[in-house]
Amino acid sequence: MKLRIERLLRIILLALFVVSCSTTKNAKKADFIEGLSAKEYWENILSNCGGMEREALTAKMSLSLDVSGKTTRVNGTMRIKKGEVIQLSIAPLLGIEVARAEISPFGVLVIDRMNKRYVRVSFTELQELANAQLYFHTLQALFLNEIFLPGKKDLTSRDLSAFDIELVGRDVRLDVRKTKRFAYTFLMQGTEALLKESLVGLKDANYALSWKYENFRSLGQKQFPNTMKLSFMGLKKPMNATFSLSRLTANSNWESYTKVSDKYEQVKLEDLIKRLLEK
């Protein structure tokens, strides 16, 4: 169980370091796409995955971690309140929570209940460690199946000019234009304009995060993926994660922020990373 939690913490920390960097907006218009102009298609994207309507999400979660060919599966809960917090709770047996990761605009809180320790780190500290501009809203968009521009909370009709857009077979590819350190690519599912993959990578290295979305089902008036597959590319050891979601609702009746018990020991982020790398 201890190894499972350490692998989970490793996945979460790595995701934070890979995503997000500031971008410069510029314009390029596309030809017609399946009878739609680029502007019309962009409006479909905003309607489906522009992030304007999903304010809360709660789901049962089965998380599968594959590190160097070794697979670990744990159950838990995913909770999100847009603009406030992302909570991942791990409760493998009888609904008893053993670990929690809480990400908010203020920073990241990781609680290891088995060892009664926790890490609390601000986004400023993460930026210094990663040497990149990190944004809460970028990570939130990945979990909510939303297209995004780093540093911007919501997209509008005017933001089409920030992307290159082209047909790739029956799908549509969008690339954020004129970024500096990171490259951002979104792959849309044909005329349905459902986001099927987000790809974030370093321009001067082979490191990248692929976040794929599958098994779309109705959630309110929209479609939402019940399966998310993450692949960390460029690492010495292959690392993948799969979120399988069920019982999805828009319930927001839960505490946004976790209060840590005084009995828990606060551990520095550097110490935690060192412990994980030693495993």
Whereabouts are the PLM-identified features?
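Gly/Pro-enriched, hydrophobic low-complexity segments
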Residues: 155-265
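Short, cysteine-centered beta-strand-loop-beta hairpins and adjacent loop/turn segments enriched
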Residues: 66-70, 95, 235-236
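Extended beta-sheet lipid-handling architectures
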Residues: 54-61, 73-75, 89-90, 96, ...
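Sec-dependent bacterial lipoprotein signal peptides
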Residues: 1-21
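C-terminal low-complexity, charged extensions that often adopt amphipathic alpha-helices
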Residues: 129-161, 273, 279
